[in-house]
Amino acid sequence: MSKKKAEDKQPIIKDEAVEEPKSDSKVNALSAKIAELQQQLDDSQNDYLRAQAEIQNMQKRSQKEQSALAKYGAQRLAKEVVPVMDDLKRALQVQVDNDSGQQLKTGIEMVYKHLEKALNDNDIKEIDADGVAFDPELHQAVQTVPADDDHPADTVVQVLQSGYKLADRVLRPAMVVVAQ
């Protein structure tokens, strides 16, 4: 036989790593360290998730505030303008006998209409009250009268002062007389 074939027939000895038996204390220490690191990782992940949730909540809150500001931003101005509308309405109810008074009344009517349009353009609307069913959210009853055929119970008989709404928010309820 040739040398190569003889070498091929020799038993192959594998290099096996001989493991030293580890002591239980070393295994326990490593297991404890792994558990500690796993706990730290879990805590960090929980903190991260909480921070993400807080950021999302802050963004939602900010969007709500911006939406409310856009929707109700004119509220302060509207509350100050509404009494002016009342004064202009009262001025328009005055009877005039001469031309100069009529011209003045026409000018007041123009101002009233422009102001009313500006309020409507900003979603500030007069509350419909005359002849409608009494709604305590929209109307403030300042007087009651007996109900009759023309005015059934719980309906508005007369509007003493107009009420106004900004979008879905009541700025001032209408002061009304209600049939009982």
From Swiss-Prot:
GO terms for biological process: protein folding. GO terms for cellular component: cytoplasm. Residues 1-25 are annotated as: Disordered. InterPro entries: GrpE (IPR000740), GrpE_coiled_coil (IPR013805), GrpE_head (IPR009012). Transmembrane segments: none annotated. Keywords: Chaperone, Cytoplasm, Stress response. Its main location: cytoplasm. Gene3D superfamilies: 3.90.20.20, Head domain of nucleotide exchange factor GrpE (2.30.22.10). GO terms for molecular function: adenyl-nucleotide exchange factor activity; protein homodimerization activity; protein-folding chaperone binding; unfolded protein binding. It is found in: Cytoplasm. Participates actively in the response to hyperosmotic and heat shock by preventing the aggregation of stress-denatured proteins, in association with DnaK and GrpE. It is the nucleotide exchange factor for DnaK and may function as a thermosensor. Unfolded proteins bind initially to DnaJ; upon interaction with the DnaJ-bound protein, DnaK hydrolyzes its bound ATP, resulting in the formation of a stable complex. GrpE releases ADP from DnaK; ATP binding to DnaK triggers the release of the substrate protein, thus completing the reaction cycle. HAMAP family: GrpE. Belongs to the GrpE family. Homodimer. This is Protein GrpE. The lineage of its organism: Bacteria, Bacillati, Bacillota, Bacilli, Lactobacillales. The gene is grpE.
